[in-house]
């Protein structure tokens, strides 16, 4: 065992710059994307600021605006986001730690959440007080006005942004028989139309809470991120008046992806990079070349559109940021092109037989579509067409009050029955980029979301019981449900209409279905004979006592060896499929007496807190293929470990 930890510790300290960068090959089609296709095209020049000499940083960031975001010589800042109060002031909740800390940047796990205030959205922000200990905060406001500041492994809550008293608490999570991918860290939140909250965890799972504080229920059984190679982290989700948006970063490839969704569960990925190093540029074209851009957060306008993105940035590899040196980190603000407000006026669904499409461009303060838009430059349709310069072309315009209606020839729109927000790209008469997404009048933007738990065998009734809940915001459509067990399917059963959050249990005969705890189940939903959803709830979970034993065992190892960083690395590798380790760990497991179960569960809960904190920031570690192979091949055994 000591040899194992020696291997981990040795590989841990071999981290290099090369190990933190991998050149990801872009799809060939991305070479043909037009301006406005990529999310990163929306970044605008940073507002003019103050530049001074004698500051920390590599040569590539000495041209920075020191009054942008938040920066202090003696503090290293990292992730955070901004809320606005009713008086118009901006409140940044950001984490940081002393720059002269013995571990340098690696002191992040002891960071403090600061509350900083500014009269300007871009800063400079000045610290008013501290909220408490914690890392990677994300603040959001509940329906009743209270403010929640999430941090890894918990949250702080207060009556308002200016509160001097913050109460610490912990969220409750129900995985609903689904595997939790990469633990529950770096959570990001978006308020839904009914003031409930949607949450995306670091691993790409989607969760929903009725009010933001009540238990978060997991809906997805796999990550919702793009189906491409990548080491994903730093998700940020938000919702505007039309749709949900999600950006996730591949920290190893230093490329981020942009996704959109009608319901927050089913996502489409747009082509092109969401951001890459170098998106922080000035009006004169000068670039602040930060080594890493992480923990993106957005500030939204009254329509929910992202108008600014904040990043945690550092001028070098994290391991090279040492105490009392020339390196450090800060949080910066970059303005965004918020896009136009668009709506399709066609009442009937757009099909291949549709001849014209009418799109209204709404007037706003500082934007007159009747005089500002270069109509000939506009293209409209599915992002799969418009992002490449294709799509519908305008044929005429009409005036509607202060708004402009553009009539497009429908040919080439690329719009299908799955479309929920067609895209427009063009230019204004000064050559500046215009873009926007249009509301379709026939689309339900508050759909039902049916989700099943793992089927359970009911011995008394001799069948399989399936619990189904509607997590959507509308009543469900007529639906039939089918259960597939180890490849064998059962007859479909009609599901009654479920109101939002309503639960219904269906009973299936067990003639064709197995009741084995290790059986593989799928629950399939059909509407009008067409499959609309397929759930794959995981295998039956081990008992709380077995889980407690596992976590307690690892907790003892952690306390004994005290190799926090190396141990964190090990946990991350094991977490890819933890349940596969249970049989090995339990080979020497002896049934514990009931009276000590409570104590074991208590210890396990304490370790889960350590575990969640430790798996965060995994991008700091180099790959160790040899050790991973040793674990997977069984060369490194865990069966000899006992309490």
Residue ranges of model-derived segments:
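Carbohydrate-active catalytic/glycan-binding domains of CAZyme proteins
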Residues: 20-343
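Asparagine-centered strand-capping/turn motif at beta-strand->loop junctions
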Residues: 468-472
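Short, solvent-exposed loop/linker segments at the N-terminal edge
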Residues: 349-354, 455-461
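Sec-dependent N-terminal signal peptides
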Residues: 4-13
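Conserved small/polar residues in nucleotide/adenosyl-binding loops
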Residues: 638-643
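Intrinsically disordered, low-complexity Pro/Gly/Ser/Thr-rich segments with frequent PxxP/GP/PP motifs
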Residues: 488-515
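Terminal connector regions
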Residues: 513-545
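Short acidic/proline- and small/hydrophobic-mixed sequence motifs that coincide with surface turns
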Residues: 473-479
């Amino acid at each position: 065992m000591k040899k194992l930890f020696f291997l981990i510790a040795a590989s841990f300290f071999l981290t290099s710059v090369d190990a933190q960068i991998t050149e990801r090959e872009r799809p060939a089609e991305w070479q043909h994307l037009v301006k406005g296709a990529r999310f990163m095209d929306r970044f605008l020049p940073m507002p003019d600021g103050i530049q001074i000499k004698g500051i920390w940083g590599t040569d590539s960031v000495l041209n920075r605006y020191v009054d942008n975001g938040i920066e202090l010589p003696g503090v290293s800042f990292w992730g955070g986001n901004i809320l606005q109060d009713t008086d118009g002031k901006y409140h940044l909740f950001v984490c940081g730690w002393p720059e002269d800390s013995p571990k340098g940047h690696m002191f992040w796990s002891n960071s403090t959440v600061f509350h900083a205030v500014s009269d300007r959205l871009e800063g400079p922000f000045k610290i008013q007080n501290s909220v408490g200990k914690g890392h990677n905060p994300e603040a959001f406001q509940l329906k009743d006005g209270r403010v929640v500041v999430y941090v890894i492994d918990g949250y702080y809550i207060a009556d308002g942004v200016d509160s001097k008293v913050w109460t610490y608490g912990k969220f409750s999570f129900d995985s609903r028989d689904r595997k939790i991918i990469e633990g529950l860290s770096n959570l990001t939140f978006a308020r839904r139309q009914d003031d409930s909250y949607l949450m995306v965890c670091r691993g790409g799972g989607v969760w929903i809470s009725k009010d933001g504080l009540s238990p978060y229920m997991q809906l997805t059984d796999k990550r919702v991120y793009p189906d491409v190679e990548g080491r994903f982290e730093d998700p940020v989700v938000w919702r505007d008046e039309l749709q949900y948006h999600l950006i996730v970063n591949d920290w190893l490839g230093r490329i981020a992806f942009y996704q959109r969704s009608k319901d927050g569960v089913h996502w489409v990925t747009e082509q092109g990079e969401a951001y890459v190093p170098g998106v922080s540029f000035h009006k004169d074209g000068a670039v602040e070349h930060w080594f890493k851009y992480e923990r993106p957060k957005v500030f939204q306008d009254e329509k929910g559109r992202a108008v600014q993105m904040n990043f945690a940035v550092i001028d070098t590899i994290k391991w090279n940021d040492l105490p009392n040196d020339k390196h450090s980190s800060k949080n910066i603000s970059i303005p965004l092109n918020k896009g136009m407000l668009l709506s399709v006026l066609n009442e009937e669904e757009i099909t291949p037989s549709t001849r014209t499409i009418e799109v209204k461009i709404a007037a706003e303060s500082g934007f007159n579509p009747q005089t500002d838009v270069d109509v000939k430059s506009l293209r409209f349709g599915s992002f799969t067409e418009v992002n490449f310069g294709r799509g519908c072309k305008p044929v005429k315009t009409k005036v509607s009050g202060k708004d402009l209606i553009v009539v497009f020839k429908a040919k080439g729109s690329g719009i299908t029955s799955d479309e929920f927000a067609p895209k427009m790209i063009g230019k204004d008469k000064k050559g500046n980029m215009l873009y926007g997404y249009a509301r379709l009048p026939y689309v339900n933007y508050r759909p039902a979301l049916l989700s099943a738990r793992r089927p359970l065998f009911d011995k008394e009734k001799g069948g399989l019981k399936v619990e189904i809940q509607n997590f959507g915001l509308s009543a469900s459509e007529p639906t039939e449900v089918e259960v597939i067990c180890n490849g064998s399917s059962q007859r479909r059963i009609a599901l009654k209409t479920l109101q939002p959050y309503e639960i219904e249990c269906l009973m299936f005969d067990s003639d064709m279905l197995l009741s084995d705890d290790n059986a593989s189940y799928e629950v399939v939903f059909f509407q009008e004979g067409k499959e609309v959803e397929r759930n794959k709830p995981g295998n039956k979970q081990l008992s709380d006592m077995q889980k407690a034993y596992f976590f307690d065992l690892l907790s003892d190892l952690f306390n004994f060896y005290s190799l926090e960083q190396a141990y964190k690395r090990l946990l991350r590798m094991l977490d890819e499929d933890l349940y596969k380790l249970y049989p090995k760990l339990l080979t020497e497991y002896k049934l514990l007496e009931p009276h000590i179960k409570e104590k074991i569960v208590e210890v396990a809960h304490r370790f889960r807190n350590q575990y969640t904190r430790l798996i965060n920031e995994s991008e700091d570690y180099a790959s160790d293929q040899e050790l991973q192979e040793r674990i997977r091949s069984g060369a490194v055994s865990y069966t000899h470990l006992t309490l």
